[in-house]
């Protein structure tokens, strides 16, 4: 059984990690241990590089905290080009897989508040009345009328980031 350290305690992210690992390695093939670690970037990262750095930092910090795991996984959400997206970073101590998620364009009224220094989650909670929306369906769930959720979009990115770990051509 793979010991997987999730560098987040966010249920939407943990669900995506668990589903993706079970899709690739089989049901019951992993045990997820969530840990809270620092990203080293602002609460609301801007730009692809800052967001990717946050995910990389979370993986590195999780490795230091739990060095005996088989995999360390981080998902960092950010804002870039008026849209929300995330970077997924997965490491197994030998190699690393990284993937960027799909992007969701955000309305100007939301972006204005985020650019003024508020994080997307609290802004979305204000507009929707859904407490801790970032730990649930997220802006993605709201603006796609539930056709996609934060977790479903993360799931795809985790699957992509896992590619180097089960395809020999990457080695």
Swiss-Prot record:
<dbReference type="InterPro" id="IPR026533">
    <property type="entry name" value="NTPase/PRRC1"/>
</dbReference>
<dbReference type="GO" id="GO:0009117">
    <property type="term" value="P:nucleotide metabolic process"/>
</dbReference>
<feature type="binding site">
    <location>
        <begin position="8"/>
        <end position="13"/>
    </location>
    <ligand>
        <name>substrate</name>
    </ligand>
</feature>
<keyword id="KW-0460">Magnesium</keyword>
<dbReference type="InterPro" id="IPR002786">
    <property type="entry name" value="Non_canon_purine_NTPase"/>
</dbReference>
<comment type="subunit">
    <text>Homodimer.</text>
</comment>
<keyword id="KW-0546">Nucleotide metabolism</keyword>
<keyword id="KW-0547">Nucleotide-binding</keyword>
<dbReference type="InterPro" id="IPR029001">
    <property type="entry name" value="ITPase-like_fam"/>
</dbReference>
<keyword id="KW-0464">Manganese</keyword>
<dbReference type="GO" id="GO:0000166">
    <property type="term" value="F:nucleotide binding"/>
</dbReference>
<dbReference type="InterPro" id="IPR050299">
    <property type="entry name" value="YjjX_NTPase"/>
</dbReference>
<dbReference type="GO" id="GO:0017111">
    <property type="term" value="F:ribonucleoside triphosphate phosphatase activity"/>
</dbReference>
<keyword id="KW-0378">Hydrolase</keyword>
<dbReference type="GO" id="GO:0103023">
    <property type="term" value="F:ITPase activity"/>
</dbReference>
<comment type="similarity">
    <text>Belongs to the YjjX NTPase family.</text>
</comment>
<dbReference type="GO" id="GO:0046872">
    <property type="term" value="F:metal ion binding"/>
</dbReference>
<dbReference type="Pfam" id="PF01931">
    <property type="entry name" value="NTPase_I-T"/>
</dbReference>
<comment type="function">
    <text>Phosphatase that hydrolyzes non-canonical purine nucleotides such as XTP and ITP to their respective diphosphate derivatives. Probably excludes non-canonical purines from DNA/RNA precursor pool, thus preventing their incorporation into DNA/RNA and avoiding chromosomal lesions.</text>
</comment>
<protein>
    <recommendedName>
        <fullName>Inosine/xanthosine triphosphatase</fullName>
        <ecNumber>3.6.1.73</ecNumber>
    </recommendedName>
</protein>
<dbReference type="GO" id="GO:0006772">
    <property type="term" value="P:thiamine metabolic process"/>
</dbReference>
<keyword id="KW-0479">Metal-binding</keyword>
<feature type="binding site">
    <location>
        <position position="38"/>
    </location>
    <ligand>
        <name>Mg(2+)</name>
    </ligand>
</feature>
<feature type="binding site">
    <location>
        <position position="68"/>
    </location>
    <ligand>
        <name>Mg(2+)</name>
    </ligand>
</feature>
């Amino acid at each position: 059984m793979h010991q997987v350290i999730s560098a987040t305690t966010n249920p939407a992210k943990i669900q995506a990690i668990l589903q993706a690992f079970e899709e690739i390695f089989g049901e019951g093939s992993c045990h997820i241990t969530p840990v809270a670690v620092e990203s080293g970037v602002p609460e609301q990262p801007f730009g692809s590089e800052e967001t990717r750095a946050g995910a990389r930092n979370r993986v590195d910090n999780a490795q230091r905290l739990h060095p005996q795991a088989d995999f360390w996984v981080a998902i960092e959400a950010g804002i870039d080009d008026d849209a929300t997206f995330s970077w997924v970073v997965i490491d197994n101590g030998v190699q690393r897989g990284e993937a960027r998620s799909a992007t969701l364009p955000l309305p100007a009224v939301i972006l204005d508040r985020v650019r003024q220094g508020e994080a997307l989650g609290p802004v979305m909670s204000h507009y929707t009345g859904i407490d801790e929306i970032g730990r649930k369906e997220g802006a993605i769930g709201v603006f796609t009328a539930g056709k996609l959720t934060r977790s479903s979009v993360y799931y795809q990115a985790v699957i992509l980031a896992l590619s180097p770990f089960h395809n020999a051509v990457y080695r």
